């Protein structure tokens, strides 16, 4: 299973562009804190900078509502690409964002507030957007039979 979950801050404003087919895509980078132990300070932190891309409605949502420094929660998958440059094989990795959420809520004064877990304090349920293909109205049983037989087949 290829699943990536990130919680970080945008390092720059997202770039919202449209492909030849008219489909939106957005490129952005997230700084994600990571604790590590150094010889001088046992509880140090550093940040990993992770390149991301989103498509369709998710890209439009990011382009409209997110800016540099804004906290973002992201679910997606890791994608590897390879190409040659000056005779050298280059490998790059990017996270494809399938869904995103606000990592903090804006208050009426324009400041942001987060809980101790970095989750939004907002009671709004409309702060998540997912890529097309997921039907929120479908049942969550994934097509499983409704009756369970207690007999084992072996």
From Swiss-Prot:
Matching entries from Gene3D superfamilies are given as: Nucleic acid-binding proteins
Q: Where is the composition biased (Low complexity)?
A: 107-119
Query: Region entry Disordered: which residue ranges?
Result: 105-154
Q: Which GO terms describe its biological process?
A: DNA replication
Q: List the disulfide bonds.
A: none
Pfam (any one): SSB
For this record, an example GO cellular component is: nucleoid
Keywords tagged on the record? DNA-binding
Q: Which InterPro entries does the entry mention?
A: NA-bd_OB-fold (IPR012340), Primosome_PriB/ssb (IPR000424), ssDNA-bd (IPR011344)
What are the residue boundaries of the SSB domain, all occurrences included? 1-104
Domain of life of the organism encoding this protein: Bacteria
Q: Which GO terms describe its molecular function?
A: enzyme activator activity; single-stranded DNA binding
Family matches, as PANTHER family: SINGLE-STRANDED DNA-BINDING PROTEIN (PTHR10302:SF27)
Q: Which NCBIfam families match?
A: ssb
Under the subunit heading, UniProt states:
Homotetramer.
| Stored HAMAP family | SSB
Q: Which protein, by its recorded name, is this?
A: Single-stranded DNA-binding protein
